[in-house]
Regions:
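ER/Golgi luminal nucleotide-sugar-dependent glycosyltransferases, focusing on the catalytic module
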Residues: 1-219
Length: 219
């Protein structure tokens, strides 16, 4: 059974390789010269300050309470939301978002998370140098889960220039026990795995990174 799954996985990779390779080579050019012309930019009711969050959403079934709750929580913590929407919004949903953001950009769903983040960063452009902190999140991240501000407090109270909430391949893969008390061995974090990376759904960057031209050029 495992062999069949592996064969199926390899076959799918083989079939999609030409498309993926084409996107890798020409995807940015295709978006910038064709798809980006259809994007729409709207000014929201929240003013711009020194903290900005690029909040990427894909409300295929409409805006949810969690979207609005997250936006309100971000505003409460002095972040100006730049909402990137990868799905066209009906008028009422658009109105609710604009009441709780600095800027709304509606675009084609091209490039997934990083395509949306790129849209926001290119829009900010020279403003990046004046931003104290920039957060990139998507709508798989919910705020607030509890009444504390652990995430924002951590960002504010540390001197770290880059913060990723979770990582992949940062810990060895093992079968975890069903109860925490049975976890006897410590999990040792290690970023040297060649597949190591921080998850894209919640990233934080300080002004030191934002004002470096290499950051903008990356996008």
């Amino acid at each position: 059974m495992k062999l069949l799954r592996e064969i199926s996985r390899i076959a799918k990779q083989f079939i999609t390789f030409p498309i993926n390779f084409g996107n890798y080579l020409f995807g940015t050019f295709y978006y910038d010269n064709f798809l980006s012309k259809s994007k729409k930019i709207y000014s929201g009711h929240i003013s711009l300050n020194e903290r900005v969050v690029i909040f990427l959403i894909f409300p295929e079934k409409g805006i949810t309470k969690s979207h609005l709750r997250s936006l309100k929580h971000l505003i409460k913590n002095n972040y100006s939301p730049l909402v990137i929407c990868n799905f066209p919004l009906p008028a009422q949903d658009q109105k609710e978002i604009l009441n709780n953001c600095w800027t709304l950009i509606e675009r084609k769903n091209y490039g997934y998370d990083f395509g949306g983040y790129r849209e926001g960063i290119l829009f900010l452009n020279e403003k990046l140098k004046k931003i104290d902190n920039l957060i990139l999140i998507n709508d798989s991240t919910w705020f607030p889960i509890s009444h504390d501000n652990t995430y924002f407090d951590f960002i504010e109270n540390t001197n770290l220039d880059f913060i990723g909430v979770t990582s992949h391949y940062g810990f060895p893969r093992l079968q975890l026990p069903t109860k925490r008390k049975d976890l006897t061995k410590p999990l040792n974090f290690n970023s040297k795995n060649r597949r190591f990376h921080y998850a894209s759904y919640a990233l934080s960057f300080s002004n030191k990174i934002l004002k470096d031209k290499s950051f903008f050029n990356f996008w």
